[in-house]
Swiss-Prot record:
SUPFAM superfamilies: FMN-binding split barrel. Pathway: Cofactor metabolism; pyridoxal 5'-phosphate salvage; pyridoxal 5'-phosphate from pyridoxamine 5'-phosphate: step 1/1; Cofactor metabolism; pyridoxal 5'-phosphate salvage; pyridoxal 5'-phosphate from pyridoxine 5'-phosphate: step 1/1. FMN binds at residues 67-72, 82-83, 88-89, 111, 146-147, 191, 201. GO terms for biological process: pyridoxine biosynthetic process. Homodimer. GO terms for molecular function: FMN binding; pyridoxamine phosphate oxidase activity. This is Pyridoxine/pyridoxamine 5'-phosphate oxidase. Keywords: Flavoprotein, FMN, Oxidoreductase, Pyridoxine biosynthesis. It catalyses: pyridoxamine 5'-phosphate + O2 + H2O = pyridoxal 5'-phosphate + H2O2 + NH4(+); pyridoxine 5'-phosphate + O2 = pyridoxal 5'-phosphate + H2O2. Its EC number is 1.4.3.5. The gene is pdxH.
Length: 218
């Protein structure tokens, strides 16, 4: 297949956005209120993994990295996710706490972008969440040295069985290398698909205890 053939196969893939627009008069003053409304609608619509978000970080050379992570909590203090503290993203966040999140709710013709910086969660917060997870997920956190190179999947499976036997009785302890982050939100952008590619975009920028709202050109 030539490059021209491949281009022809994907260049026509598009659709019209017809689900409705977003108007300034309908926006709440706090973006988290709108985010909660949209997330509830994504759940009600049966979207797969509605809390899945693309998490973008950068390394010391300015190279961006992205991965899908699940949002686990949000409130006025920010948005929370958990991870292995030895992972690539955690190591990058330790050196540069700047972060970007993106929630892609394609079926609803919506997306939400979040910009901010992270802070580590307290051990108490992490412990409470860790013990709310399914037992096998707790074991999985112990097994994987995230982002490290391994020779085969069997290495993980053998370690899982070993730890399952080790922790058969009683509570599984919190690994010292497992934790979480809270994103201190500085701005949020809400995108709603529109007819003729005239999409609606609204940008919330934190100003002290309030939010400045601007409409952006699509």
């Amino acid at each position: 297949m030539t490059d021209s053939d491949r281009l022809q196969q994907i260049a026509h893939l598009r659709r019209e956005y017809t689900r409705g627009g977003l108007r300034r008069k309908d926006l709440p003053e706090d973006p988290l209120n709108l985010f909660e409304q949209w997330l509830d609608q994504a759940v009600a619509a049966g979207l797969p993994d509605p809390t899945a978000m693309s998490v973008a970080t950068v390394d010391e050379h300015g190279q961006p990295y992205q991965r899908i992570v699940l949002l686990k909590h949000f409130d006025r203090r920010g948005m929370v996710f958990y991870t292995n503290l030895g992972s690539r993203k955690a190591q990058q966040l330790e050196k540069n706490p700047r972060i970007s999140l993106l929630f892609p709710w394609h079926m609803l013709e919506r997306q939400v972008m979040v910009l901010g910086s992270v802070e580590r969660l307290s051990t108490l917060e992490v412990l409470k969440y860790f013990h709310s997870r399914p037992r096998d997920s707790q074991l999985g956190a112990w097994v994987s040295k995230q982002s490290s190179r391994i020779s085969a999947r069997g290495v993980l499976e053998s370690k899982f069985l070993e730890l399952k036997q080790k922790f058969m009785q009683g509570e599984i302890p919190l690994p010292s290398f497992w934790g979480g982050y809270r994103i201190n939100i500085e701005s949020m952008e809400f995108w709603q698909g529109g007819a003729h590619r005239l999409h609606d975009r609204f940008f919330y920028q934190r100003e002290g205890d309030a939010w400045k709202i601007d409409r952006l050109a699509p």
